[in-house]
């Protein structure tokens, strides 16, 4: 699968990363239309790739503001109707911190999204102050181990222990586990030995445009694994 990344081509400051403008979008209320724009754009590309025979899923990060919005699940349902992409091929990622900011609302929203068939992932797992009493109620399919634990796990024993424990916890809960921030073959091999389900990071690829991704999928050994049989 792939994850949607949004950048802002600012007329004065050039290409801005999300951490430069997402907080502003949240403060001004622009995060809602921005999220819907990203969802439509991501699903449009996913639809095209799937029609070309590439069995891809699409992940989109959502804000705490989205997860607290009672209208959000309905909006997602309407957007899904616009594209020939199975709901299970859309994965919405939310951080632990976002869930715990309004846990009751978050649980209710996630239940409605799950009822649509959309998959939910907890992003940056291990960096927030989550309550297991709420996490066990969330109908999540996946947890993503934050890159701060993964990138140096080959050299840092504590990081390695945290990653191993998180993989075991996720699997014991029946969840898939993804490691973020994989930059070397050594780390990839260690994750594989732990039975980690998936990984993402510069070892696989740097961020790509939609056109660049299409070419990468056709040429890279990683991309060829997504081709439909």
Question: Which residues are covered by each model-predicted region?
Answer:
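Catalytic core regions of nucleotide second-messenger enzymes
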Residues: 14, 50-56, 84
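Catalytic-site/binding-pocket detector for metal-dependent nucleotidyl cyclases
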Residues: 29-30
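EAL-family c-di-GMP phosphodiesterase catalytic domain
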Residues: 3-13, 22, 39, 46, ...
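Conserved functional hotspot residues or short segments at active or partner-binding sites
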Residues: 109
